[in-house]
Amino acid sequence: MLKANIKTNSKELQKKYKRLEKKLPRLIDKGIQQAGFQLVDIIRTKTKKGIDYQDSPFAPYSEGYLKQLQKEGKPTVVDLWYSGEMMGALTPSIIKKTGRNKATLAFTRKSNIDKAFFNQVLNEPKREFFGFNQRTESIIQRGFNKFMIRQLKGMRI
């Protein structure tokens, strides 16, 4: 007859599992907020380059608006950066109302919401800067995955 004694570290494993279970929701929220900041940066960068969220160039400004910009000494490139106020007011947040594991991008002031709505929806031609395509989504997803891997490795579980 063969006898075998097996030692397990189940208590240590339980302790590590509980620690992971406790920290994981905060790590996910932090990663999602970071993804929100990355999306804001991508939107600002594309807009500054004069391209919409689908990587198409913005429609040109009207002649009247171009004359106004020239008179004021402002750049005439179509980049939606008249004063920088609208794009500066774009911020990400994790609001519990939107649901778990979601980030929301919003403008912080009503006047900037109105400007963005005008450019995105009402203006003809539309200049759709507020959104993202499949390529942008993949970039953000890779960034989130890298962040989570770094954080989990740092926990040494």
Where are these regions (language model features)?
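Short, Lys/Arg-rich flexible segments
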Residues: 1-157
